[in-house]
Curated annotation (Swiss-Prot):
GO terms for molecular function: 4 iron, 4 sulfur cluster binding; chlorophyll binding; electron transfer activity; magnesium ion binding; oxidoreductase activity. Chlorophyll a' binds at H675. It holds the Pfam family PsaA_PsaB. Phylloquinone binds at W692. The keyword Membrane applies. It comes from Phalaenopsis aphrodite subsp. formosana. It is a multi-pass membrane protein. GO terms for biological process: photosynthesis. This is Photosystem I P700 chlorophyll a apoprotein A1. One of its GO terms (cellular component) is chloroplast thylakoid membrane. It is found in: Plastid, Chloroplast thylakoid membrane. It catalyses: reduced [plastocyanin] + hnu + oxidized [2Fe-2S]-[ferredoxin] = oxidized [plastocyanin] + reduced [2Fe-2S]-[ferredoxin].
Length: 750
């Protein structure tokens, strides 16, 4: 740590009234661009309007102005999030069976939407138990509400109103910090101050206040609920906060107040700050006292982290110093210059954040089933499947977004004249080695993973099961994965002696946890079938990375097009007269990467859905006999391509295909409609622009004949626009099809 002279005093970092609020300005379509503001000559205008409305780089090159627009837009985004949350809570308050579910969560399914009878669609209101008819929801809101200690629909109402207040505050803040008091560029670039405030404030105090809420409100209320007390009899949240004796009845150490804390006798608090591991056998969720302990610990860590960076005092870390000191034996100048990149290119900053947040989202997807955090979440199979699928898709999109913004940074913000021999320059200089090796890895994984399946299909077709790769013939056990499982299962005795059980039951070693006759979680066995599909995961992920990374590393130049940087982020081809140069722009790599991301995530959610139905989810009899939903057929059926088609896609689609005339029929309609949206995308992806332009001109001729031709000249979509429309429908159609397939299946059988 370098001791320096004190930093100068805090400067004024806002401009007052920089931009006047003008409704006339906002009412003029395309006011942000001279060209678009002129109004439409051709139908391309409406596409350009949408493409450029939020491309702030194209409005101005002034970094301060761009930063202010992004900052203001973030408040708008937060406002929409609060509005959405308010809607969720309002539905819980007004249209749901939350109070009934709270009294009997094992027999009543959550519902928060009742369909009005207009043309007979009240058939969708299925019987969810307890005499309530509505649409079964799978968002996990009921479980999170119970965990946070909400016991009545009135409380949900109040929270919904609170969220609306916050939404309007955010809207106001977005306007205020752009039109009235806009931060200067220096404020956006003050990374040490930003780190301190975000770490100590958002994460530190945020976690601390949540831990406080969990200890003083959630824990006692959940204690009463678990003991079967009627929610209406339970004291209200503020009573626990104001009256310490109430808490002391449940947790005697509360009577001693803060004394054990200051006398370092912290073990006294172990009643409500526990370190148990495993699941609560009553609710099938993590121990709420473990979760409170976790948030308290996280809060301490982040409060410390939020005091590590040098701001107005001559003490603490400077980010620039840390980055410039970061040199390795093969990295030349290392991270020299990275500080300048990340404080002047928001695309570079965003790219890193998206990559990390995307990875984190996928980690969350895996924790939601392996360590279900909320009460009764683990036995609500529809919600389990939905949460996993949702977080996997979101994670995939965020990671593709990371590559997109990395490529935009390369094209728009990277300055090769000032970047010499730093880490990024070194990566760019050996990009051919990186991409060709990655390509080899993809070929290897593709041929070998599919080769194993094709071998099995062939042997199966020829009636030679003894020659197949399977747990009962030629075994390919995932020994490394099993070793990882075993290590974690033994951790409580070895590496984590303070814990009573391992972090998750899926590692093995424990007894299964069942709640209300349904399996919450049990040790998940891994075998040859998982080994095979795992290599398909490896293959699809590597191909996605190959496409995205090639797009980033060759965004500015390639042997084919040395001056690619001059053509911009998205362009269809390198002009007329140069054949074979289409689909090379950075944008096209994002476009192609999206399809492979879709492939990758689809295989993951199919694997998860079938594996859980086969080996985890099911019912348990009084004698302790477990009956799984698909009877453990994953290990033998999923080792052939034919098995995936026959026993997963076809067999499990029967519920959605046969849903007509039942309360699940909306899923049947969605299944059909989303297939149509998906197929519609192929029309955009498999035909050229010229075809449509010819057709349009013929149609315009007919309009001219009838004297009904519009003033705005119709144009076919540009090549890039066509691809954008195509990939959008492909992904939305595919995702909605999968959603209908999964939910109709799991609500019917789960």
């Amino acid at each position: 740590m370098i001791i320096r002279s004190p930093e100068p005093e805090v400067k004024i970092v806002v401009d007052r009234n920089p931009i006047k609020t003008s409704f006339e300005e906002w009412a003029r379509p395309g006011h942000f661009s001279r060209t678009i503001a002129k109004g439409p000559d051709t139908t391309t205008w409406i596409w350009n309007l949408h493409a450029d409305a939020h491309d702030f780089d194209s409005h101005t090159s002034d970094l301060e102005e761009i930063s202010r627009k992004v900052f203001s837009a973030h408040f708008g985004q937060l406002s929409i999030i609060f509005l959405w949350l308010s809607g969720m809570y309002f539905h819980g308050a007004r249209f749901s069976n939350y109070e009934a579910w709270l009294s009997d969560p094992t027999h009543i399914a959550p519902s928060a939407q009742v369909v009005w009878p207009i043309v007979g669609q009240e058939i969708l209101n299925g019987d969810v138990g307890g005499g309530f008819r509505g649409i079964q929801i799978t968002s996990g809101f009921f479980q999170i509400w119970r965990a946070s200690g909400i016991t009545s629909e009135l409380q949900l109402y109040c929270t919904a109103i609170g969220a609306l207040v916050f939404a309007s505050l955010m809207l106001f803040a977005g306007w205020f910090h752009y039109h009235k008091a806009a931060p200067k560029l220096a404020w956006f670039q003050d990374v040490e101050s930003m780190l301190n405030h975000h770490l100590a404030g958002l994460l530190g105090l945020g976690s601390l206040s949540w831990a406080g809420h969990q200890i003083h409100v959630s824990l006692p209320i959940n204690q009463f609920l678990d003991a079967g007390v009627d929610p209406k009899e339970i004291p209200l949240p503020h009573e626990f906060i104001l009256n310490r004796d109430l808490l002391a009845q449940l947790y005697p150490s509360f009577a001693e107040g803060a004394t054990p804390f200051f006398t370092l006798n912290w073990a006294k608090y172990a009643e409500f700050l526990s370190f148990r591991g495993g699941l609560d056998p009553i609710t099938g969720g993590l121990w709420l006292s473990d979760i409170a302990h976790h948030h308290l610990a996280i809060a301490i860590l982040f409060l410390i982290a939020g005091h590590m960076y040098r701001t107005n005092w001559a003490i603490g870390h400077g980010l620039k110093d840390i980055l410039e000191a970061h040199k390795g034996p093969f990295t030349g100048q290392g991270h020299k210059g990275l500080y300048e990149i990340l404080t002047t290119s928001w695309h570079a900053q965003l790219s890193l954040n998206l990559a990390m947040l995307g990875s984190l989202t996928i980690v969350v997807a895996h924790h939601m089933y392996s360590m279900p955090p909320y009460p009764y979440l683990a036995i609500d199979y529809g919600t389990q499947l939905s949460l996993f699928t949702h977080h996997m898709w979101i994670g995939g999109f965020l990671i593709v977004g990371a590559a997109a913004h990395a490529a935009i940074f390369m094209v728009r913000d990277y300055d090769p004249t000032t970047r010499y021999n730093d880490l990024l320059d070194r990566v760019l200089r050996h990009r051919d080695a990186i991409i060709s090796h990655l390509n080899w890895a993809c070929i290897f994984l593709g041929f070998h993973s599919f080769g194993l399946y094709i071998h099995n299909d062939t042997m199966s077709a020829l009636g030679r099961p003894q020659d197949m790769f399977s747990d009962t013939a030629i075994q390919l056990q995932p020994i490394f994965a099993q070793w990882v499982q075993n290590t974690h299962a033994l951790a409580p005795n070895v590496t984590a002696p303070g814990a009573t059980t391992s972090t998750s039951l899926i590692w093995g070693g424990g007894e299964l946890v069942a709640v209300g006759g349904k399996v919450a979680l049990l040790p998940i066995p891994l075998g040859t079938a998982d080994f095979l599909v795992h290599h398909i995961h490896a293959f699809t992920i590597h191909v996605t990375v190959l496409i995205l990374l090639k797009g980033v590393l060759f965004a500015r130049s390639s042997r084919l097009i040395p001056d690619k940087a001059n053509l911009g982020f998205r362009f269809p081809c390198d002009g007329p007269g140069r054949g074979g140069t289409c689909q090379v722009s950075a944008w096209d790599h994002v476009f192609l990467g999206l399809f492979w991301m879709y492939n990758a995530i689809s295989v993951v959610i199919f694997h998860f859905s079938w594996k859980m139905q086969s080996d985890v989810w099911g019912t348990i009899s009084d004698q302790g006999v477990v009956t799984h939903i698909t009877g453990g057929n994953f290990a033998q059926s999923s080792i052939t391509i034919n098995g995936w088609l026959r026993d997963f896609l076809w067999a499990q689609a029967s519920q959605v295909i046969q849903s007509y005339g039942s309360s699940l029929s909306a899923y049947g309609l969605f299944f059909l409609g989303a297939h149509f949206v998906w197929a519609f995308s192929l029309m955009f992806l498999f035909s050229g622009r010229g075809y449509w332009q010819e057709l349009i001109e013929s149609i315009v001729w007919a309009h001219n004949k009838l004297k009904v031709a519009p003033a705005t000249q119709p144009r076919a979509l540009s090549i890039v626009q066509g691809r954008a429309v195509g990939v959008t429908h492909y992904l939305l159609g595919g995702i909605a099809t999968t959603w209908a397939f999964f939910l109709a299946r799991i609500i019917a059988v789960g």
